[in-house]
Amino acid sequence: MAAERGARRLLSTPSFWLYCLLLLGRRAPGAAAARSGSAPQSPGASIRTFTPFYFLVEPVDTLSVRGSSVILNCSAYSEPSPKIEWKKDGTFLNLVSDDRRQLLPDGSLFISNVVHSKHNKPDEGYYQCVATVESLGTIISRTAKLIVAGLPRFTSQPEPSSVYAGNNAILNCEVNADLVPFVRWEQNRQPLLLDDRVIKLPSGMLVISNATEGDGGLYRCVVESGGPPKYSDEVELKVLPDPEVISDLVFLKQPSPLVRVIGQDVVLPCVASGLPTPTIKWMKNEEALDTESSERLVLLAGGSLEISDVTEDDAGTYFCIADNGNETIEAQAELTVQAQPEFLKQPTNIYAHESMDIVFECEVTGKPTPTVKWVKNGDMVIPSDYFKIVKEHNLQVLGLVKSDEGFYQCIAENDVGNAQAGAQLIILEHAPATTGPLPSAPRDVVASLVSTRFIKLTWRTPASDPHGDNLTYSVFYTKEGIARERVENTSHPGEMQVTIQNLMPATVYIFRVMAQNKHGSGESSAPLRVETQPEVQLPGPAPNLRAYAASPTSITVTWETPVSGNGEIQNYKLYYMEKGTDKEQDVDVSSHSYTINGLKKYTEYSFRVVAYNKHGPGVSTPDVAVRTLSDVPSAAPQNLSLEVRNSKSIMIHWQPPAPATQNGQITGYKIRYRKASRKSDVTETLVSGTQLSQLIEGLDRGTEYNFRVAALTINGTGPATDWLSAETFESDLDETRVPEVPSSLHVRPLVTSIVVSWTPPENQNIVVRGYAIGYGIGSPHAQTIKVDYKQRYYTIENLDPSSHYVITLKAFNNVGEGIPLYESAVTRPHTDTSEVDLFVINAPYTPVPDPTPMMPPVGVQASILSHDTIRITWADNSLPKHQKITDSRYYTVRWKTNIPANTKYKNANATTLSYLVTGLKPNTLYEFSVMVTKGRRSSTWSMTAHGTTFELVPTSPPKDVTVVSKEGKPKTIIVNWQPPSEANGKITGYIIYYSTDVNAEIHDWVIEPVVGNRLTHQIQELTLDTPYYFKIQARNSKGMGPMSEAVQFRTPKADSSDKMPNDQASGSGGKGSRLPDLGSDYKPPMSGSNSPHGSPTSPLDSNMLLVIIVSVGVITIVVVVIIAVFCTRRTTSHQKKKRAACKSVNGSHKYKGNSKDVKPPDLWIHHERLELKPIDKSPDPNPIMTDTPIPRNSQDITPVDNSMDSNIHQRRNSYRGHESEDSMSTLAGRRGMRPKMMMPFDSQPPQPVISAHPIHSLDNPHHHFHSSSLASPARSHLYHPGSPWPIGTSMSLSDRANSTESVRNTPSTDTMPASSSQTCCTDHQDPEGATSSSYLASSQEEDSGQSLPTAHVRPSHPLKSFAVPAIPPPGPPTYDPALPSTPLLSQQALNHHIHSVKTASIGTLGRSRPPMPVVVPSAPEVQETTRMLEDSESSYEPDELTKEMAHLEGLMKDLNAITTA
């Protein structure tokens, strides 16, 4: 409080604020905030002080028992008093409705009647106290673990034992780790009193040193954990008199690795037994420990070492050395000391303004190294661009905003515990402006230098202060689209430039600059948008990477500086990985070499190096592999066994040490053997490293020998196996025949076991290598057990009570098994009191090892059952033919998938010849293999079997759904997506749903199917300036997956210049009139509502509008005059020809022939590019044919089916067989198909011969028929039987005079509206309504029976001239690969062979038009050509020009009306 009062007095001093103003620009961004106590505010502003808010008491880890009560303490201090809540496992507890949990007045949590069972553990877990002050913030306490002791379970029972007087003895009692504190011992059913000679180790084990007669008796272990006591087996400890002979020195209990926390006590157990009685000494890291003079080190009974108040210096390797004068043995263990997290520097309270950068400091220590996380007002702080963890543990907040205010806590956690420390952040308001003048906005703010990670800004002084020597400046900047703004101040007054550092490459930033004077901050400059450059300056690979082994556990790696460093190399990152694993580790290095320690011995590692400069990581070097040096083996050979061959030899068998413990190439084995009697000489024999057995000969008859084996590498000898004994025969016995029957067999049944005893065969001259015991209910062949030849009794365990068992006993040797001896017994009922069979206590048992190696399972098969289940079956050749398992063998099944790569195997054990593998992934290939294990021996893995699970419907929607507008086409959008992350099979298709109402039923959405190999789709003809919602659903062979979340997209606004060409190109016809096509350069006036991006635009000036109207009128008058002059110059001869042709009734093909010189005017289409050409009569008898392809669009060519309605339904919501580069569709086409027409033309504009015809009125509907079925649209050329050139026709119809049947058999088209112009020859029309379109065909085409494709013409702009066809878009024609071009005859060829006619439907203004077929007939014979040439003499009606001019006048009036509107 004194510091606060001093801060207030300081803040009220004007000189202080002048000094702060001068230093404002000198502050670094991260240090621009005031630390606890001083608030950097201007005079007059209210000062907020920091509020004390902290925990007085925090909960700690607690151990409880079932049924008891427990209190977790918690108390917090604040003014006003905080509200206390509790979290369990991260979730708030509802204490209002909880009967067993209640909140105490001080904030502690009281839990009554703790519940804990095997399947219900509601009280055990992690608890956290949360304190909240409504107007201040929230803090959370450390996390405390509540452990509830489980039900007492003995993992190890005490066993009967005997001890010589004066020696040491132990009795095991292993229970659950959490129940060890509740263990006690009883002797003869009375509590055992512990003293310096009789102690209980922390594990619960009882140690009796210097045993006396009084120590003998019955012992049992008792666990009392709140419920009824749990008793272990009661066993007898016998104290035998001192035999005064020498016995082996052995460890009864060896130390094991331990982990303790600083401040705890630890006991390193070590108990040895032998005669003479051994003494125990301890060493730490090869230094002897003085347990007599040290107060913290105590030698307990039996030799165990107790260390009190453990410190970090106590960590290390401890050696227990037992010595009895004749022999010395030692054991070692590692003690690891851990430390709870502790704060070296705690975060402090901070004052700051908005847009400033601050740093909360937090420095912790602990072992293992703690992890640090930050919490703001009780919520986790997730690192981002503006919340960063710097210098390992500090929290940096960039660009403060008001919502950042509150309490921040640094929480440190490791395996031992956790701790928290917090601080408060207060965001201060800027001081109000004084009455003095403030500076205006700085001028000409520009980015003078733009780099990848920094931008330099410069500006001019404000206009209000041209000199600006006393002005300071603040630059505010933020990422585009981010509301959080940061500030950078100039370093001294008058400086007009600043460099913004630590920016992201290729990122857009928004900058603004404000000037400050002594009165306050002025106006802000206009925002400046600048994009940083992309990152390209990264280091190259480090050359000359080398690695060499420095020791068995370390490797040194060296390298050089990259040639292309692109700047100063800041550091290197060295990556290394053990061969055969997928876990790569890394270490930061500042030099050009590094030695990695703690590696595995004789193991291969790979290394690579990546250089870092200020831009980031560079290119990695190639991997370099090296192996650590070899060392002596760290483990003994495995599976040592002895086989007595005769009276003078014994065969030894063994297996190499485990691969991980060989530590190098095994170069040999050292065999040591001696007689079992004490003080006998040891003999050594060396064998090669590939040899796994050795025959030891020259032994004494009837003598017991001890054997042990050790492995060797070039570095030395590893540890040896334990001594194993075998006795040679008294004499060389016969092994040419099987042993005889054992002389006797006795059985003694118990409740769940049978004790079997026997005597050897009477004939002692035949070798007996062991006995085989068979037993089973009703049959002795169910189970078989083999025992050593010296064994005379055996206890068969795990039998059923009250069951009849048949038992057989056979002696065997290497020749085979002898004659069996049978016996039967009935186990006792379960109600009988179990008794200990004293006959078998301490009975030696030496099982005979199976001499044959284990064979792997065969015939492994994988049967697919479902999408996540596969059954694995196999056979075992080591079993009998009926494949019945009669021993304790088991099988291990392993499986994995190769997707993703380097996945690890999963394993499961089975006791049958099959296993059901569940929980697999759908549509995934797995490989399986099986291994058999019997005792300590295992086979190799079997051959692998493979199986792929069935598919399943996708369980996740398509991801990354994005919608963008297509450039240049505002009505077209492009939908992109990525496949589902859980496709569960091959994706066969997608369905896109879109609608303008996100809440509409899904069946009301428009759907767009897409094939499965596409990840993008175009949708056309959407409404402008309209929000659409899109969802995507994936499907595979099993069905549809879930839909993605709705993605909203608003189509852009477009002006009329954009709309006109788009509508025209897509053929979208609307009802009502349209604006005429005034050319691509014409742009009508736009209102503010039609401006792009929705921004209002200023309306056109009225004078400009008047000028446009007058100009259009003048141009129109000029065009009309030109057309009138052109038309009046037609010759009289041409008019006569028209009249004659109109009155002629010789031909049945009635159409308007195009005169050679007549060129009907076209007001909106450039007829210089494409005109109606007449047909010239050429006398050339050998015309030259040209093959001209017709450009087509697959969207506009639709095969004609039986009816037009069926065509429309086929196109609706279905896949298209042939799609263009981008899949396209229209919304209008989904609501109702708009008629489409396509008018293909020759790629050479002057070539096509086109005739335009009127559409019949509604009163006289005409029908177009096809005489045969349609051909496939994929056919490129159809050949006339009698013609040498390919022809491309839409259909073949005979002359109407020759065939009228074709007219009656064709399907009808849609009714045509009345044409705006009528033909002059109406009196010659077919009364039955035959079509007026021109058809040309030959009789040979009818006979051929070929069916040809029909193309539909898409209507062009409704105000285009009826006399001139639509001009295809400029540029080279595009061809659909599915619909190849059909050749047309050239103009010259047509003059001699055929009068080829294309028909186009011409409708009136504003009316919708159905599709009409475009007919390109084939070439007729010569005689047909002659007749057609005669028909071509047709000419116009005398009044035809008048009608055309009248029609043209109507169009002019429409244009004038639109222009003036």
From Swiss-Prot:
The keyword Repeat is annotated on this UniProt entry: yes
Predominant place of localization: membrane
Molecular function (Gene Ontology), one example: BMP receptor binding
Record's compositionally biased regions (Pro residues): 1366-1375
Signal peptide: 1-33
Entry GO terms, CC: cell surface; glutamatergic synapse; Golgi apparatus; growth cone; intracellular vesicle; nucleoplasm; plasma membrane; plasma membrane protein complex
Tissue expression as described in the entry: Widely expressed and also in cancer cell lines.
Membrane topology reported for the UniProt record: Single-pass type I membrane protein
Region (Disordered): 1041-1097, 1138-1160, 1174-1206, 1235-1276, 1289-1381
Domain Ig-like C2-type: 52-141, 152-238, 243-336, 341-426
Positions bearing Phosphothreonine: 1198, 1404
Protein keywords: Cell adhesion, Cell membrane, Disulfide bond, Glycoprotein, Immunoglobulin domain, Membrane, Phosphoprotein, Repeat, Signal, Transmembrane, Transmembrane helix
Notes on the domains: The Fibronectin repeats 5 and 6 mediate interaction with RGM family molecules.
The protein's name: Neogenin
Organism, as annotated: Homo sapiens (Human)
Source species taxonomy: Eukaryota, Metazoa, Chordata, Craniata, Vertebrata
